[in-house]
Amino acid sequence: YEDHPMMPRLFALLLTSLLFCTELAAETTYQPFVLASINDRGLAEQTEATVSALESAGFRLAGHYPPLPNANVIVVTSPRLQAIAAQTERGGYAAGQRVSVTERAGKTEVSFVNPLYIQYAYRLGDGMEEIHELLSKTLGNMESFGTEKGRTAKKLGKYHYMVGMQRFDDPSELASFDSHEAALAAVERGLDRQGDGLTQVYRIDLPGKEQTVFGVGMKATGASDDEM
């Protein structure tokens, strides 16, 4: 068979196919959001239905808030999400999964933050694939969106908003305390302060670790043009 006249051509086609597949795998990109569904329900009814579906799938409601009159943001967590978040030093940011319900042109759109995007951006270990699959099964998965081209896992791991700003592993340290409990108390006192436009939306404590993530809502107070 080695001398068959078709063998060189078949070998070349096979090699080209392998190189093409390798290139595709290397260039897999991820978008930050997933459009789950478009529905005929009103905002309040669709929000309630979305929370109910998430709870039936094993998620727990951690908090929610309306950033706009026509939108609700739902934050859920679960033992599995918290276990994934606890694998790494700064994984706590991934303990809350955000889902949005937005009313637009007589329809309501349900979207969620892409767990795979979060996995690479927050440098987590494995596990967010199953969260992605569970959310897609529970809420739907029509398309991914959010950026023009998406980002590869490698680029997400090095991402920072602009030159001179911190990367994920170089955060700003705001204060230090004698204990984790003292730090938590100080944060909650600050978020309880009236008149500054900040509200605590949720708090998630990672089991077995001194790591807590707070979700904060911010409202413009009109005190400065810099707010916008």
Give a label for each model feature:
Residues 60-61, 117-119:
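Primarily extracytoplasmic ectodomains and periplasmic/lumenal surface modules that are beta-strand-rich
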Residues 220-227:
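Preference for solvent-exposed, low-hydrophobicity sequence contexts
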Residues 72-114:
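Mid-chain, structured segments of secreted extracytoplasmic proteins
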Residues 27-68, 143-219:
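Terminal, regulation- and interaction-focused segments at domain boundaries
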Residues 118-154:
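C-terminal partner/receptor-binding element of secreted or periplasmic proteins
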Residues 12-21:
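Bacterial N-terminal signal peptides
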Residues 1-6:
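Short, Lys/Arg-enriched N-terminal segments with co-localized hydrophobic residues
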Residues 22-26:
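Sec/Tat signal peptide C-region and signal peptidase I cleavage site
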